[in-house]
Curated annotation (Swiss-Prot):
Its EC number is 2.1.3.15. Belongs to the AccA family. One of its GO terms (molecular function) is acetyl-CoA carboxylase activity. This is Acetyl-coenzyme A carboxylase carboxyl transferase subunit alpha. Keywords: ATP-binding, Cytoplasm, Fatty acid biosynthesis, Fatty acid metabolism, Lipid biosynthesis, Lipid metabolism, Nucleotide-binding, Transferase. It catalyses: N(6)-carboxybiotinyl-L-lysyl-[protein] + acetyl-CoA = N(6)-biotinyl-L-lysyl-[protein] + malonyl-CoA. Acetyl-CoA carboxylase is a heterohexamer composed of biotin carboxyl carrier protein (AccB), biotin carboxylase (AccC) and two subunits each of ACCase subunit alpha (AccA) and ACCase subunit beta (AccD). The lineage of its organism: Bacteria, Pseudomonadati, Pseudomonadota, Alphaproteobacteria, Rhodobacterales. GO terms for cellular component: acetyl-CoA carboxylase complex. Component of the acetyl coenzyme A carboxylase (ACC) complex. First, biotin carboxylase catalyzes the carboxylation of biotin on its carrier protein (BCCP) and then the CO(2) group is transferred by the carboxyltransferase to acetyl-CoA to form malonyl-CoA. The keyword Transferase applies.
Length: 319
């Protein structure tokens, strides 16, 4: 288990409990269960206190936790007959974006998501979830296919932002993001999005311009990272805590503002402490959102999606 900075007191207690049990495994005559159980209860109480009222900055840390389920985990856990499709038919295949045909609850769908990777090798391969233009063009290709065959689209958003490298800019990063956002608004099929970790700027919006948007309880969704905002406004990246407060980037704030439609509850201690439980909860949320949309006419779906985004800013601003 990887512990976040604010979880250090918890790591000490859980570490002691594990040490006691390790000693008992090596010496069967030792009876440490009573003491270890007391430490477990103490750890659970502390965990509840730590997660009872997380600050926006701490939610950012939880959203970035390396042990959270990623796009690949959700695809493997919720979808069957997944057939990945590669490439943008123009330049290359971007591994930061996964996507393909699959079945959800035995119904055919198109699933698209950003994948960060789970270790050093896969994080480099996936570019830490930061898509290049060819990734967004791959997403456009998949959405066009979904529109053609009348298949619902499910997107899983988890990115610090689109890749800002020189090559990406030369190949039209801004245009690719804009085209992907435009395509989201055009397709006449149900489109639902779930922010499963970080929803960073236009890199997230390009996949999240949906009829229905859900966020995991401790995920974040923002126009810029707190560090980036602090660097611009205060010329000091260390002011990220103040920036996180000002950005209103939590699921709770965004639900009040009408930016998202649903908050998916996470297990105590975050998705990283209950991966299977979190995957199942996301699956139930997707099922409920699709039920609201499947069977609607293409014209209704396009109008609903456009109105949703045109109306943003008219709710919750006085809060």
């Amino acid at each position: 288990m990887n512990y976040l900075e604010f979880e250090k007191p918890l790591s000490e207690i859980e570490g002691k409990a594990e040490e006691l049990r390790a000693l008992a495994r090596g010496n069967r005559e030792m009876d440490v269960e009573k003491e270890a159980s007391a430490l477990d209860k103490k750890a659970e109480t502390l965990l509840k206190d730590l997660y009872k009222d997380l600050t926006p900055w701490r939610k950012c840390q939880v959203a970035r936790h390396p042990d959270r389920p990623h796009c690949k985990d959700y695809i493997e856990g919720l979808f069957t007959e997944y057939t990945p499709l590669a490439g943008d038919r123009n330049f290359a295949d971007d591994h930061a974006i996964m996507g393909g045909l699959a079945r959800f609850n035995d119904n055919p769908v198109v699933v698209i998501g950003q994948e960060k990777g789970h270790d050093t090798k896969t994080r480099i391969e996936r570019n830490f979830g930061m898509a290049r233009p060819e990734g967004y063009r791959k997403a456009i290709r998949l959405m066009e296919m979904a529109h053609r065959f009348r298949l619902p689209v499910i997107t899983l958003v988890d990115t610090p932002g689109a890749y800002p490298g020189k090559g990406a800019e030369e190949r039209g990063q801004a245009e690719a993001i804009a085209r992907a956002t435009q395509k989201c608004l055009e397709i006449g099929v149900p489109l639902v999005a779930v922010v499963i970790g970080e929803g960073g700027s236009g890199g997230a919006v390009a996949l999240a311009t949906a009829n229905r948007i859900a966020m995991l309880e401790h995920s974040v969704y923002s126009v810029i990272s707190p560090e980036g905002c602090a660097s611009i406004l205060w010329k000091d990246a260390e002011k990220m805590r103040e920036a996180a407060e000002a950005l209103r980037l939590t699921a709770q704030d965004l639900h009040k503002l009408g930016v998202i439609d649903r908050i998916i509850k996470e297990p105590l201690g975050g998705a990283q402490r209950g991966r299977r439980e979190t995957v199942d909860a996301v699956g139930k949320a997707i099922e409920m959102m699709l039920k609201e949309l499947v069977g609607r006419k293409p014209e209704w779906l396009v109008k609903d999606r456009r109105n949703k985004f045109l109306d943003m800013g008219s709710k919750g601003l006085a809060a």
